[in-house]
């Protein structure tokens, strides 16, 4: 058992502040040097990385069906009988909380004649002590067991247990609920997260309470949209009236943890500390962008003094050139007051406006241009776009296809 287990008594606020101070030291140095943490050099990517249908199919099957995919947080199903729909990866799946406290995932399909048990789409959630099919009223408990079957005699000789819901691998770890949508081996979530566990544990995601959810879309390949979360090179130009007003452009501190990473983007207040002795620096709260392979970004930040929020972006392909982002904001340590809830909702609305109208706008335009670019055209990911390079390298490795 390690400190990353939320049951271990740890002062997580102190841990976050320790992480914040370590990150601050690096960012003060970067701002002083007017530099950023870099890869060894630029990385050219053939346009096919974004537009090739064969590559997209490999990503769909090997990543979105075969890898552990974040379906939600523990707080999305806090009580036995709670459930939510997870259908963005392809198959319609329901994730439930059983009486034993375990999270489970099942195909959203009645084992009688295949009807949908829950007809709503993601991000729908509900409390149902019993899950009843709208077609013929077959009924299941949250553990997937068939417990109700009208005209039961009509199915004499049919093994009841064989008609329990069809389960998909599911694992809950550090407040994260992972599902392998295409089925297959059980999920070892601790192994999947690896060395990133201690960082994610400090976010106390098991305490996060959902505040607002929605969907953002882009007429772009999902990776083109994902790229914008991993670099701050564009802040001064694309976000000139928003984050460009508060944060340095093209300055970032990057930590890689296997296939995952964390990026810190310094605000202008960091520059004020360049000429100040470290022992005179004020206490700093933790914040950062956390990427969980292959498609999830978790941002931890604040909306005021001692008022934090967690934003989760989960990007999914609806086609080679169609992206759907399931976006949610959480109160990291519970909602508490109506005022705090309103602040979290405001953070959701402001972020959605910027991402949809700025980041996803240029992603859509860029993707359209790649479709008509010369056959030998390559985009280039700069050495200053360190984390973007890592994302593409790990995706290419996972699907077994070279980048060029």
Describe the residue ranges of each PLM region:
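Short Pro/Gly-enriched beta-strand edge/turn motifs at strand-loop
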Residues: 65-77, 149-153, 293-297
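N-terminal short leaders/motifs
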Residues: 24-53, 121-134, 164-172, 241-275
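C-terminal catalytic domain of Rieske-type non-heme iron oxygenases
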Residues: 2-14, 171, 176-404
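Rieske [2Fe-2S] iron-sulfur-binding domain
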Residues: 76-183, 187-194
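N-terminal pre-ligand scaffold of iron-sulfur
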Residues: 2-121, 170-172
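Solvent-exposed, flexible loop/coil residues
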Residues: 49, 53-54, 60, 74-75, ...
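Short hydrophobic core segments
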Residues: 59, 109-110, 132, 225, ...
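Short linear motifs in intrinsically disordered
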Residues: 71-79, 159, 286-291, 328
